[in-house]
Amino acid sequence: MKVTLIAILTCAAVLVLHTTAEEELEAESQLMEVGMPDTELAAVDEERLFECSVSCEIEKEGNKDCKKKKCKGGWKCKFNMCVKV
């Protein structure tokens, strides 16, 4: 009885992992397709750059030291700009 239960749970775990890996590969392949528009990525880049610059300028006008705003998603704030890490 125990062996059957362990076998069923193992098969279920393998199936879940396989499905997750397959979905991830499919998502990556869609991103890697040639000719896919990057306009959305460019818009995000511009937005992060703008947010970082504006945040730093506002702090400078308030006579405070410019504390760099943390950028999200693999970006960091440097020279009043968000740059990819």
Curated annotation (Swiss-Prot):
Pfam families: Toxin_20. InterPro entries: Hwtx-2-like (IPR012625). It comes from Cyriopagopus hainanus. GO terms for cellular component: extracellular region; host cell postsynaptic membrane. PROSITE patterns: HWTX_2. Monomer. Its main location: secreted. It is found in: Secreted. Neurotoxin active on both insects and mammals. Residues 23-48 form a propeptide. This is U4-theraphotoxin-Hhn1a. Disulfide bonds join 52-66, 56-77, 71-82. It comes from the Eukaryota. GO terms for molecular function: toxin activity. Belongs to the neurotoxin 12 (Hwtx-2) family. 02 (Hwtx-2) subfamily. Keywords: Disulfide bond, Neurotoxin, Postsynaptic neurotoxin, Secreted, Signal, Toxin. Expressed by the venom gland. Residues 1-22 form the signal peptide.
